[in-house]
């Protein structure tokens, strides 16, 4: 393509800008349609329905602001959020590029938590939140730094540091010129060629462009029309005149993504009512140290029931709804849902996107209720192509060979017009099998057009195919998408002109996935450098490099060659005068760099290894100005612009450059903590240059490009003659960062301006470094309270900041104890600790030690000690008391605090995961960076899962065990309310361990309200249709991050996207596969794009989380947690209460850090049998017979019981094919078997569904006495133990889509693989499962923990016996097994297996069919009488399965450590 052609962008439409620029009250329906057609292409609105999106299009506004403009400040009321169209925005440590959204509210916080600076001239869409009353945390208050609407700072009564004159912010933007619109030139145009925005804009604009551009959207003055119209937008973003309110009613918990959180009277009353029932009875003592444990029987300590019933019990099954629609009734939203659901299925994996779309438009939905139904008879004509979307089927061929098809497999007609017949008999193997069918004629027509959509590009010399492109249609746009190609072609496509309407993420996907097929990234960068020399590609290459650095800075940090190329590119930007791009590059490098530890060794006669600049005397950190070659520093990777954070684990913020050099030359071994900070380094160099005499001849450093000098203003306000607009932008950026950190210092403005150096702030003395602009919690009052003792054991509570030093604490303590007459140098702060052995240790703290509240242990106290005395501060008789205070047990801890601490810890790891870690882990790449945080996140899931089982099985008292079970259910519920689904699922998995489920005496003491609570959580993770309910809910809450997703689901999606698609196809890179993986990773990364405001999220569910949770947690990441603004009402809390709250958090942290978990299934079984021995029955055979006779009646289809689907009952009666247990169609029109006598099965299905009716279960009449007896036993899981003998057990396969556990068998000589339900446990050691070749591929040195959670109570809480097998039935999934993959890296499986200690139990062989284990051959309690055939099994006359030959899967087997063994009681559930 010609690079000189205009760029194509997702919103590059002059009509769009013409419509958007119009005032909202002047827009016509055509204008709204123009805005809608463009916005619907953005990822921000990908999950938004038509109604809410059109409502936004009516009120969305256009704004354009100059570079260096402060859009909003920390503390301002958030009245709107933004979508960037062009330019770039800096918010804390993140740079936002075009088409990214920013400025959204977090939870119920209605105030900004960060400053926002425009780095370039930027255009944006402004979306106002609905107006709300001033209540709910919105009481008027003066922000920490008051500003006018133009961004001009105003002086407040309390002296604060003011930013320099920012008059540039108030400059009104001129109206645009007459079309065609020329290129925009920034203020630095005189210095060099101006860069284009990262993504261009249309070249023509309307003439009636408004001259008066609106000011910041945080302005309190808005047009009266906007105020009037915004009041008409409901909470879900739907306007009053829309007719799709029912469709988005389930999204009522959403707010920000569809226009905000309107706090109307109903929602306010609901929230207040929830708090009155959920938190008002939570007394003050509940947060104290001793009374902090919430009572299990207190309703007030329970999570809010209303929040659950509204947001989780009513989850729709959107996939089912879309499938049940007539093909002609499906719209674009339905199509998007179906494409997302089908993309992971093997039948669709190799098909082009255009073919998938056509198939989804033609497919019809069919349901087979009962297992054993004949779906296709032998020699029956095939008139459709079918895909299994739930369940599995089996084909028995005339030769006796059996072939099984599982979820995602296809069968039926081939895409040829010839008549085809089916060989063999196909039967369903489980209940509720679901299929999608495409008529043979339509299937042939669609598949015949594959060649029409694919174009191949061949080399002009060799004729070899170098790329394949597919023509796709997205909305109203049609364009070509590169799907396969040679590496060189993929690289060159970075600078080719692409149609961004149909392929907007190619650059992002390539920069993430190139490592799969290119080992050396320097080849890519060198080509970019060559293209940079061409003026045609220069701006485009500059944007590519900036995007690369901003998204994957670890590619440069861990590769010295890449770092050198980046410095070359930096010099090229300076040479060509591209200062704006260079500024962005410096900012990106500074904010994305991470601290690293370097160990330097030297000999006595070695010279200096590096040259340093800065230091305390200049008000800056110590920076590395130059690294000398052939030194230890060069070999260890020390770089120019590295900031020195620590030297031998001591802070370097008070070091001067001379002192640092002395340390380097005077030590033979040094441990340095370094962090690259180009921005701070260049500011330091700029200050040095500015302070030099004009005739000075000294150099600032060899080879240091002085690109962005920052010149300070004098007292008179005159700037240096060399100050330009670029330096003004950098000065303003640094001033914003500094003022945000110094706003609580009580210094006058005059004193700060007249100071030659920047005064260190309270929160960060080294303020010149942008890398130190970290602070998840910024409070205007002291965050901590210390309890300081004297030697007479009297104490005082002292409010302190996190940065208050030990020396300051001594001074405060002397004042509190009225000892001001004594000098503070005579006193010191000591920490007295009592060890487990009763030994009292005492140490004096350094005067400069900070963060004292987090440093102290539970078995320690702070004492005020006179330096002239040597008496012991803690007498011996107090030692036992200190040890008793240090003891922590789970039952004594507050469940909500435990859940919140788990959430913060998990999110701190999850948010630190780099996107490249997923690729490195998935493809097993040999990367220098690796996947450290991803592996840590994997371990967290396993640790939390094993912790639950260990804690319960360790407790020997049955009452306490029951309380522990209830405590864990509450913690899981709170985790769900906090959107920590990972910990929620881990806790559920721990509760569903067989060692826990078998504890009958404990479960029968768990009240029904906790069982209902557990059932609600189980419904959220219903495994049917690939956990569609969880995925739907995740898609909704993902619009308002943060969220901690379920890691096993992420791992499974990535694994099957990798295994189900080839990386190479005909010597070409299958980039479509890499797109799919990159899309999944991109969605996961968005979940951690905002910090946790955990207090607001807790209030949303009716609870209250103390501020101490955030104050007592220091994280490596800056965006882990944040405080809600406007918390002044909590500043007057008593010191004692604040201390007790912090003490509870310290106890929770100490408990979680000291967890000892048992990760061995057999050991847990032994512990479980020890605390609750197996109850032996007298007549197992009779018991089995009675069990077999209690068979449930046939259950209706899930959609008939699904209350989540709007209009599901009506559509189910029209569009579902229902079959009874005998194989006949349940309809008024006939009873013939499915497809046996009909040559046109599809037409027959479509005609029969009009008259088909749902088969309901007959009502069950029970007497009150029976109900009472049943209610006493309903919470007891019917599990008798894990029985095993020396006979071997069979391996278990993991189904890709539903995460169900199915069994197959295979001998050492290579028996035929089985992916279905039948399996024999032969020749496999106990507790060992294997994966098949079409499942997860596991290396021999890795293993997977198979998590199989089930309902522990065994029965439905609403009926004595659960009647339905449908997971959609409320409370009726007790007999199903939620099988999930915890695909985590664990230790290699041992070569020798521990023998089962319970050899006297007999072996059970069984089916695992659709989540339900079913017996086929039993000995012992699970024996079935001969006349009873377990439902769902093939006939008993089925021939014995002969072993086949399948050697490939044997070579790919990996041991799954400690998997779950099915007990006889489990398989007896029929």
From Swiss-Prot:
Acts as a guanine nucleotide exchange factor for small G protein GTPases like rap-1 and rap-2. Required in the hypodermis, especially in the seam cells, for proper formation of the cuticle. Disruption phenotype: Beginning in the L2 stage, onward, animals display striking and progressive defects in morphology of the epidermis. Worms show molting defect and exhibit a trail of old cuticle that remains attached to the posterior part of the body. Longitudinal ridges termed alae, which are cuticular structures secreted by lateral hypodermal seam cells, are poorly distinct or interrupted. Sensory rays in males are malformed. Developed a fairly normal gonad but have a strongly reduced fertility. Show uncoordinated movement and an enlarged gut lumen. It comes from Caenorhabditis elegans. The gene is pxf-1. PANTHER family: GUANINE NUCLEOTIDE EXCHANGE FACTOR, RAP GUANINE NUCLEOTIDE EXCHANGE FACTOR 6. One of its GO terms (biological process) is molting cycle, collagen and cuticulin-based cuticle. Residues 184-193, 215-224, 275-292, 1198-1211, 1349-1370 have a biased composition (Low complexity). This is Rap guanine nucleotide exchange factor. InterPro entries: cNMP-bd_dom, cNMP-bd_dom_sf, PDZ, PDZ_sf, RA_dom, Ras-like_GEF, Ras-like_Gua-exchang_fac_N, Ras_G-nucl-exch_fac_CS. Disulfide bonds: none annotated. Belongs to the RAPGEF2 family.
